[in-house]
């Protein structure tokens, strides 16, 4: 079984998240994409984040009806900050060797990977699928990771990815870039502007019903 793990704040989830997930599912023929909202994002400690409950409900509504998409609240079950290394280890320990993990993240996040907890260990635990935008020129791993560490990953032409000493690969894959952001959606709601077609209707209705992001 091949599972993709897609973490994020999802405040709120939007069409960009969903489209990227669908394209990566198709590219790697994944059996499942698991959406994992961060409970306490370590890189956003100073920012106000909507309650986990509301973000969970919005994700559940957004993926409803897609049998390949599922939800996990694993990061809300742990106390303290939400670290990706702990989430990946949770799935590996729970399902042992019955799943192959593809950790999904954007190119901007990957370029900041050295700020993550136990990032070197994380890169050896599972496959990484780095989402790139049209026109993005891959600088290779040496332009992102320390040279000595990057040398452990050898480009595998057949897989079109960088294979590490653990056998897992780091892939760079171009996906459709929808210029949508959660922060823009929040700002639009606050200013009374339409968010139709930026997020699923079910999420839009939930935001309105619960007066999220609004000053009312």
Curated annotation (Swiss-Prot):
It is an enzyme of class 2 (transferase). GO terms for molecular function: ATP binding; nicotinate-nucleotide adenylyltransferase activity. It comes from the Bacteria. InterPro entries: Cyt_trans-like, NadD/NMNAT, Rossmann-like_a/b/a_fold. GO terms for biological process: NAD biosynthetic process. It catalyses: nicotinate beta-D-ribonucleotide + ATP + H(+) = deamido-NAD(+) + diphosphate. Belongs to the NadD family. This is Probable nicotinate-nucleotide adenylyltransferase. The gene is nadD.
């Amino acid at each position: 079984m091949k599972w993709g793990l897609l973490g994020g704040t999802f405040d709120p989830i939007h069409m960009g998240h969903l489209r990227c997930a669908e394209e990566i599912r198709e590219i790697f023929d994944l059996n499942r994409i698991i959406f994992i909202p961060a409970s306490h994002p370590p890189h956003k400690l100073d920012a106000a984040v909507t309650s986990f409950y509301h973000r969970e409900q919005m994700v559940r509504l957004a993926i409803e009806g897609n049998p390949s998409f599922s939800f996990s609240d694993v990061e809300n079950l742990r106390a303290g900050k939400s670290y990706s290394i702990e989430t990946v280890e949770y799935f590996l320990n729970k399902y042992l060797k019955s799943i192959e993990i593809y950790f999904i993240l954007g190119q901007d996040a990957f370029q900041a990977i050295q700020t993550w907890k136990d990032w070197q260990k994380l890169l050896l635990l599972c496959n990484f699928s780095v989402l790139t935008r049209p026109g993005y020129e891959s600088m290779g791993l040496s332009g992102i990771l320390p040279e000595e560490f990057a040398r452990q990953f050898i480009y595998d032409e057949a897989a079109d990815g960088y294979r590490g000493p653990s056998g897992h690969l780091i892939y760079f894959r171009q996906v459709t870039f929808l210029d949508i952001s959660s922060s823009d959606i929040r700002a639009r709601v606050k200013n009374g502007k339409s968010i139709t077609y930026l997020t699923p209707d079910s999420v839009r209705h939930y935001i309105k019903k619960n007066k999220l992001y609004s000053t009312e």
